[in-house]
Amino acid sequence: MVQRVVDRDYYDILNISVDADGDTIKKSYRRLAILYHPDKNRENPEAAREKFQKLAEAYQVLSDPKLREKYDKLGKVGAVPDAGFEDAFEFFKNLFGGDSFRDYVGELNLLKELCKMINEEPELKAIEDTEESKKQLQREESKEADRLLQERIDVLCKNLLDKLSIWTETDMSDRVTDAFKQKMQFEAELLKDESFGNEMLHAIGSTYVQRANILIQSQSFLGIRGVWGSLCAKGTLLKDTWNTVVSAVDVQSSAAALAKAEEGEEQWSKEKRDEAARELTGKVLSATWKGTRFEVQSVIRTVSDKILYDKAVPLEKRINRANALLMIGQVFLKVAPNEKSDANYFEDLMNDRGK
């Protein structure tokens, strides 16, 4: 027997039954939050922002047993959280690793810009929107972006040097080496439990290994292996760039098809629309992750190269840095995700639907 509630609105917003369990509520919210993110619905940003915030509001109430009980008995008025409703966009700030990876990559610009762009209220412009004013604004924004990026790189270089010094500023004996690897293994095991933690570790680890090997192998006979490694790295970069663009185009195409079906232009059954929505969610995740991975690896390359090719530092010490970086990268690449972990929900959705 289905329980009686005084208000079904929150349940309808999340597309769940009134007797849905906590796991069902969480999964439905996560899927809908990805699908209806305002950045994917730019034709009507105000309506999209409102819908997105309602999703977060419904989830905050129904995911809390005490608030849910109040809502079922009293409706929305009786179920307002003591601290008010959370910002829906905080969800996206923690989508790829959150603060746990900040020491490695800083604040991710892609997600920051998505949240900033959608969260800002439209403002009346005080000056005429001329071509010249647009160019001036672009120049100012570009200059500020360059400044922030340089600050970010400087901080990340210091963070990485501090981490490498745990090994490089010692006698680098077998005992110290084993302890260093164990420390990094312990850190990696904690990081992998974050949202997209395993993917983040592999993106960072593969770049560490790549950059470290290029320097180490450049010291071999004629440096041929180092040159080859550099060429392979450029090929990987081109491939990743292409895949990122293709994913974005695929999302636009799928979103347009689903929009037509929702508006009744295409005669799709409910089952077909639901399946298309699930597939689109996976594709959105896949495209967003590829863009994020591109940014992560770009930053990691810049930081790694800056500390490995600092001419003010003796070559021997830079080689030691490369060896420490190589060890961290290898540890990160060996990390495997927890089977059937709730933290892997997004990854599973992306891998199932975003191919």
From Swiss-Prot:
Compartment(s) of residence: Cytoplasm
Keyword Chaperone: yes
GO cellular component, one term: cytosol
A Gene Ontology molecular function term of the record: Hsp70 protein binding
Keywords per UniProt: Chaperone, Cytoplasm
PROSITE patterns, sorted: DNAJ_1, DNAJ_2
Single Gene Ontology BP annotation: protein insertion into mitochondrial outer membrane
Pfam families per record: DnaJ, DnaJ-X
Domain of life (superkingdom): Eukaryota
InterPro entries attached to this UniProt entry: DnaJ_domain (IPR001623), DnaJ_domain_CS (IPR018253), DnaJ_X (IPR026894), J_dom_sf (IPR036869)
Start and end residues of each J domain: 9-75
Keyword Cytoplasm found: yes
PANTHER family (UniProt xref): DNAJ SUBFAMILY A MEMBER 2 (PTHR44924:SF1)
Family note: Belongs to the DnaJ family.
Protein name: Uncharacterized J domain-containing protein C3E7.11c
Organism in which the protein naturally occurs: Schizosaccharomyces pombe (strain 972 / ATCC 24843) (Fission yeast)
